[in-house]
Amino acid sequence: ATGLVTATAEGDPVLALSGQVKRSDLLRSSHQSMRNADLFAPITKYAAEVQDPDNVSEIIANAYQAAESGKQGASFVSIPQDVTDSPVNSEPIKPLVAPKLGPASPSDMTYLAHAIKEASLPVLLLGMRASSSDVTAEIRELLSVTELPVVETFQGAGIISHRQIDNFFGRVGLFRNQPGDMLLQHSDLVIAIGYDPVEYEPRNWNADGKARIIVIDDVPAEIDHNFQPETELIGDISQTLDILVPLLRGYQVAPGSKRYLEDLQAKLQDSDVPPAIADQKVLHPLSIVAALQERVTDEMTVAVDVGSHYIWMARHFRSYEPRHLLFSNGMQTLGVALPWAIAATLVRPGKKAVSVSGDGGFLFSGQELETAVRLHADLVHIIWNDGHYDMVKFQEEMKYGRAAGVDFGPVDFVKYAEAFGAKGLRVNKPSELGQVLDEAFATPGPVLVDIPVDYSDNAELGAAMLPDQIY
């Protein structure tokens, strides 16, 4: 269930097939009898149970279509044992051809181009549905001929390439206190492209509900008090952007806004610099991020688990290819990083993957090291180790003045890795970080690296938060 609700929240198309007791046992208190489809209905886009063998193909076809269409997500099909054993007399449904959308209305595109030119400081807010390869290419083309500033959500990471770095003002998500948040507050026109509220609730970046918003997407917006678009350009996003490019070619930010953007860009760059700490005993988060940044290449996939480390990574780790820096921002599912990294080595063969977790989150799926070893997955898993569920800990301390239920005993992660047949490494002091990471990245197959981390500066992560942002 956790995997499917994560897929639905994050917009990942998944089709799950499940066994079920035979139909005659469905209403009995028999072994393993439960209403599977009813259980999964609230957390999937489509959930059904096959009652007639001749309906199997129809149900599978509709489940597949639901998972792939609109806002993508999970579908679930339950198949009773006696249905599985029965002959099927009906013909299978022919392969589906997904409907193709055209661009948005020409009049709406003209309206948007005019609105951008009239605004003092328009900004693009790029979300997860803007991260497909074709949409990313059009966004990069648009930025090559305009000066439009850009903010990414965590799940929009990598849309901006090295060439558009001057247009980039960071990522926003979870806590409202970043340069990108300042830009959204200062802007008089937010163009939300492929943005989903689950990535970063509008109440966080548009608390007063006064932002002027125009949407470019392939699905209608989800409206609430803090997200009321002036207009929506609904259609194929890449085709819409392709038509917008000539309408906006040569656009420059208003002179009065350029100094503000220069100052904001300086803030963003300064925030990435690790602090100088004399006689450092345990590594600062920014030191770990910087060391990873030096070693991770653009073609590597980096999957990030949930925890304090994920906030530091989302804010400060730069990725320049779409869908190469992965976060679970919808459900914030603990344990996703290692399985995602294993999957990345399968869909991107020959490319090393990196997964990053806390010591608590790692133990939600650490057993998948066996899978990684069996598949010879070429990955490096980094554990930020502090002996706590720290993301919960620092928020409890901010809200209640103390923490409870967040501490656990030491785990020897090196021996844990070795027990599964993986290589285990540990950073025993800050000066060893570079050497240990070099060894890890040079080693083929699964490698686990245990890095002690100092989260003393975590209070800064939550600075200037709204009261209801503390979970």
Positions of PLM-derived features:
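Short glycine-rich anion-binding loops that position phosphate/pyrophosphate groups of nucleotides
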Residues: 20-21, 81-82, 128-131, 156, ...
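Short beta-strand segments
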Residues: 78, 303-305, 450
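A conditional alpha-helix N-cap/helix-loop micro-motif detector
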Residues: 56-57, 102-109, 173, 282-285, ...
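Generic enzyme active-site microenvironment
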Residues: 215, 303, 356-357
